[in-house]
Amino acid sequence: MLYSPLYQSIRLILFGALGLSSLTVSAAINQTDSMMPEPLVTDSSNQYADDVATDAGFNNEINNQDISYQSDSQQSAAYKKASLSSDATLSNDAAVNNNNITAINDRTKTSQDSRVAPVNTSNAAKAGNRRIDTNDESIQESLKRLAEFYELTPDTNVATSNNTGTSVNDEQNNIQNSLTPVTTNIPTVGSNLRLLPHTVDSAARCEGQWVYPKKNPNYQRAVNEASASSGQPAPNLNGLPNNQAPLFAESDYGYYDNVDYAELSGNVIIDQGTQHIEAEKIVLDLSNGVAAAQGKVMFTDQATGNVSVNGAQDRTQQNGKTSLTDKATQGGLIGVADNLNYNTETGQSTATNVAFASVELQAHGYAKRLNRPNESQYELDEVMYSTCPPTNRKWQFDAKSIDLDTETGRGEAYNTTFRIADVPVFYLPYFNFPIDSRRGSGFLLPNASISSENGLEIDVPYYFNLAPNYDATLSTHIYTTRNPMLSGEFRYLTENYGEGIFNGSYLPNDKEYDGEDRRSLFYDHYWSSTSIPRLSGEAKYSYVSDADYLNDFDTLGLSDNTLNLPRRAQLNYYNDYVDGELKVETFQTLDALNNNGQMLQDKDKPYSRLPQLKLDYRLPWAKHFDITGVSDSAYFKKSIDDGSENEKSGTRFYNKLSASYPMENSWGYIKPKLSLQHLFTTYDEDSLVDNSLDKDDGSQSVFVPQASIDAGLHFYQAGSPFGAFDDTLGGYRLLSPRLKYTYSPYRDQNDIPNFNTRIASINYEQLFSDSWFLGHDRLQDLHAFTPGINYRYIDATGVTRFDGSIGEQFYLDDGRVTLDNTKPVFTSSSSGLVWDTSTQPYNNVWVDVSGALTNSYDLNYITTELRYQPSDRSLFNVGFIKRQRDENTNQLPLSALTASAVFPINNNWRVLAQGQYDYNRNQMLDSLIGIDYEDCCFGFAVYGRRYYNDLNIAEKPTQAIMAEVRLSGLGSGSSRLTRLLADKVLGFEPVQNAWKD
């Protein structure tokens, strides 16, 4: 560019405007959303990576390239002589640092003595809580100018759009499908139903959306002309970083005195890459050290000319994966101001009447005055922020003043008020908050809930930023029916020793629990070796003061009501040949009822492992043989203090060595295998005394060989079943019959204690296992053959439309090995018929059915699950389970129905429900129902749950009523309700993501 001072003026104004606005949005976002603990880091030198407030001296080098065809001297004369109409200037200089700008009101060059700099108000008084009057004429004018970039959404009829009307994208897809010879899918079932809206338009929740200003159409033309004059190819501006893009300026008038004063005025438009600024006048006065943009200033860092078919710019959906602070620093800002001023000597900047909007966040705000007294400090006066539409601001944050410091990464807000429908909800005279990724101590957002057990509960957490690699949170829980409870969390992260978290709580003299003290302590630690690959470890500790603790202080039952709370330390290692685990584990067993409705005794508690070593290994040197081994050694301890039985603690060693010779081909396989198992157990001293045994009688050793042959065939055929879907789905079918023979002889094991072994539940895959015992305290005598068959249909798109298996295990000899000196396992002629099927007849319908019959072909159990998803945002599940008592597997009887539904009523409202009903007991075991509201401004949900404690089904049910309010654009988007439904409702997470999008 010919005139470097003028070029510097443009650069300073352009980047200064964007820098000031970016800090304003970051301040507003962080003030409301940063009240959540950030992830811990081990690097203590965290810095603010997106510091837009850097000041530097501007480049004084002259770039002589412009779009004019005149000589340099001719251009100089032209600029000094007169004003130029439609003046356009272009530069490829991208070496100038971004600097914040201030604006002056001088329209002519002033003397050095009359220099006027912005006033530093960093020490000004912050008193007073006068609210920001958005009806003020100057504020209304700024917001009105900003609202030019809020594009209203045309009214749409959802039902009509479902029946008729084809979008451009649909037409393009139809054309593509007609040109591509691919099979078509079966249409989704229920597409013609109109009971509920088939399509929910998230965009229709808003009156409109913020859109980017359009790029100057002369920009690319100027770039092309400049490149042509220099004999170089024109750069492609799409995707080119802004600091590498040419700079283009256009105005009605341009002036330069060839010394220290330059000016553009009259419809000034400046572009560099996607950055765009407009003003009535831009001035650079080197003698006074000021640069200025004056009169109806507008700026953005994402100017675009690309418009989607519906007239609005496309927005990338983040699905909650990016933090709000990160989104704010990604750009997408639009701002308007009366003027911008920048002092080139001190770096001080000011702007007045600044209204800003973030397209990425769909948020907007206002600041009466922005001042940057130095490179690291910012001052904002009379600030407003909201994610609501400018036409209907349902809530907003107001602050009398905000001070930001990029060196410390902290901000201070004075006289902050949160308003809903112009009604103040809460007020903070002073609030300290972070403005970057560095964490800081302070209060987090409080929570409130109502339940039948605790009444009204209010939680007030306080966050302690102790160090970059550890922090803590202390919470006070206030109940209307109990005494206050104090809980805390401590997190740490080390460079070489892993990471962990402590959680604890204490409630003295609980009025709802006979005045007893209630306590809990949980600890988790995870570690991966930095010096030994694939070596890791973990530690876990759990403690509660009573069996009712988890139920009483987890209102919606989000914590697992585990009967046995684990306490363990564990090391893990694996490579290509070895997978090992060494652990020490004990349990806290809570008071509960057993299957017979009696209180648990010591004999019902699990064994501690002190310690246990497990190894799975494979020998590498056998070329055609597959030689594998299993080793499981442990010392099991269970003290019997209530006399419920004699103590049986001791050491167990189990080893199994197997050799197989697999013969595999595309059409089938045969896998013969030989195994040798060894089991050795010995009682400890306490158990020998309790059982009146000597050392020899207290030790047992058993060897059991095993032989098996597993064979299968694969039959492939193109086309659909019976040719029914050849013209639609296409695809192919696979038929895989399988037969396995297993033999292992009987060995007496009645004197061997059972430490942790149980009988597996019956299912199709279990039919082909080597043993029905899960655990290594019993070596089964099994002489059986198992036929089975699997049939699959896969369509042309790769979707498995049907997957079904059926099989049965037939016994050639009766089983004689018992688990606990009771009835032997499987003394009948067969296991009974077992099946497992999964079907997807339509793209939005799934049906799963599995079950088993007894050897006399009576029902053993059956489970069914039907899932119907009429749209991306709706879901219906219905399930049924019926189980008979099975003496072989200790299966308890159950007859239950399960159902869940998530469906929208319209674009804003939806219903959520889930339930489980035991019709044998005529009892609703678990039920939840709620309504959820969502628009572009805020959301809320009201829901209730009634459920039984899993530890004691005979107790009265727990009832809870909860309400939550969400402010769009603030918070993580996750809640207690969504976390609960994600655990209870199959397929909920994708439906939830679609609803939020």
Curated annotation (Swiss-Prot):
One of its GO terms (biological process) is Gram-negative-bacterium-type cell outer membrane assembly. Residues 1-27 form the signal peptide. Keywords: Cell outer membrane, Membrane, Signal. GO terms for cellular component: cell outer membrane; transporter complex. It is found in: Cell outer membrane. Its main location: membrane. It holds the Pfam family LptD. Belongs to the LptD family. Together with LptE, is involved in the assembly of lipopolysaccharide (LPS) at the surface of the outer membrane. Component of the lipopolysaccharide transport and assembly complex. Interacts with LptE and LptA. This is LPS-assembly protein LptD. It comes from Psychrobacter cryohalolentis (strain ATCC BAA-1226 / DSM 17306 / VKM B-2378 / K5).
